[in-house]
Amino acid sequence: MLQGVQRGYNLPELITLEQYQYIRDHKELDPVLAGFVGFGCSFGGKWYGGYARNKTGTNYALQSKRSLLKDMATLQNAEFVCGDYRRLCIPPGSVIYADPPYNNTTGYGGEKFDTIEFWIAMQLLADTGHTVFVSEQEAPPGVACIWERPFTRTLDRNKSNQFKVTEKLF
């Protein structure tokens, strides 16, 4: 998705429930659109975790588009890679930003994610001259947190199931 947006892909400003369902069921037809809808138009930003909607009629597609384009304005020269971190060929001295599934949550695609193996790999990359940043809520002992922000996470559209979490960057 990020590669497509970087190349000038025109993101939609509105996605209906019917469009959401069609795109979800036909991701292969337009991977950029599938990525945008899968995260930006899904409840809680969870990959196809249900069509995002609320009582106030928030336009999640427009909100996501604006946010993404604002972020991309400063990332035009970045190289985005989507894939298994264990299979990437990373040039020496790279800056790496990793956004793994949070520990003790559902992994991407519903698969179990090996958090311990991931952190070992990130430490190895850091030890071999890369600058590594990881978004998570927790890290192994000895890994420094360089930024954090508390926020409220909502598990249903009626906001009756909310809890506080702290997003961190290590």
Question: Where are the regions a protein language model picked out?
Answer:
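Class I S-adenosyl-L-methionine-dependent methyltransferase module
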Residues: 1-82, 86-87
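Class I S-adenosyl-L-methionine
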Residues: 78-97, 102-170
